A protein has these predicted regions:
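General beta-strand structural signal in soluble alpha/beta enzymes
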Residues: 23, 88-93, 108, 166
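Low-complexity, intrinsically disordered basic tails/loops
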Residues: 20-32
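Glycine-rich phosphate/diphosphate-binding loop of Rossmann-like nucleotide-binding domains
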Residues: 29-95, 104
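Structured loop/turn residues at beta-strand edges in well-structured enzyme cores
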Residues: 101
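Active-site histidine-anchored catalytic micro-motif
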Residues: 14-23, 57
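Glycine-rich beta-alpha junction loops
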Residues: 27-29, 60-68, 94-98, 109-113, ...
Length: 238
């Protein structure tokens, strides 16, 4: 209740202890500030349901700069709404900080979010291919590859896209997992595992309860702001 549109959410690799949740990654290419705040709320509740020991997740708004004056009108209005909310909003975050754990939940519209996701996927694929080519270039490089094999296997495992298969269609009264059509059986198994974890954590009921509480707090803040603006308008007239 209170969610206008569902969003595609996905956990991304991070150098921090926990993964980073990003949404929307393509379901809604054009969003209002209110809808982006809704995404922040449902992302916040999902993260808390899956990582209760983490506490209040840090919410970041994906933008072209960290300053609050940066971005489109929609993004700047969203910034103001998130700042006045009871969420743990840490401000704007640039795309180069997404994989460094600067925020636990990253919010964007589906247009920007999908471009970010595809850029990350492309960069990982490019770097993997470039490393492979360099190690196969000559005999010396091949010998170096043998020595570096344990580290390379660890890196490959950490960045394996199949491990992150299974995007969540968040904001519905049910568990919906969207799998990548080009993945293999291992990728599908991770998507099924994601569905299992969501069902086991009872995330739906927790999200519904949390969303209701956050919306009630947000409406109270809006009412207070409207009253203050009305009072200021009256004082200006006098």
């Amino acid at each position: 209740p209170g969610i206008d549109r569902p969003a595609i959410a996905k956990f991304l690799p991070s150098d921090s202890e926990h993964l980073t949740l990003a949404l929307d990654l393509g379901a809604n290419v054009d969003c209002t500030p209110e809808q982006l705040v809704q995404f922040a709320i449902i992302g916040n509740e999902l993260f808390q349901a899956l990582y209760p020991q983490k506490g209040s997740p840090r919410i970041g708004l994906l933008n072209v700069g960290t300053e609050d004056i940066k971005g489109t009108d929609t993004v700047k209005q969203t910034f103001k709404l998130l700042k006045s909310s009871k969420l743990n909003f840490i401000g704007n975050i640039e795309s180069n900080g997404v994989l460094y754990g600067e925020a636990d939940v990253i919010v964007a519209d589906g247009f920007v979010g999908n471009i970010m996701l595809k850029t990350i996927e492309g960069a990982v694929k490019f770097m993997s291919g470039a490393i492979r080519q360099e190690f196969q270039r000559n005999l010396f490089n091949k010998m170096a590859a043998v020595a570096a094999l344990p580290a390379l296997k660890g890196l490959k495992s950490k960045l394996d896209p199949r491990k992150f298969n299974g995007a969540i269609l968040l904001g519905l009264r049910g568990i919906v997992i969207k799998s990548h059509g080009g993945t293999d059986d291992i990728g599908f198994s991770y998507a099924l595992e994601e569905a299992y974890h969501e069902a086991k954590s009872a995330s739906l009921s927790k999200i519904e309860q949390g969303v209701a509480e956050q919306f009630a707090a947000l409406e109270a803040i809006k009412a207070e702001q409207a009253a203050q603006e009305a009072q200021q308008a009256e004082e200006t007239k006098v």
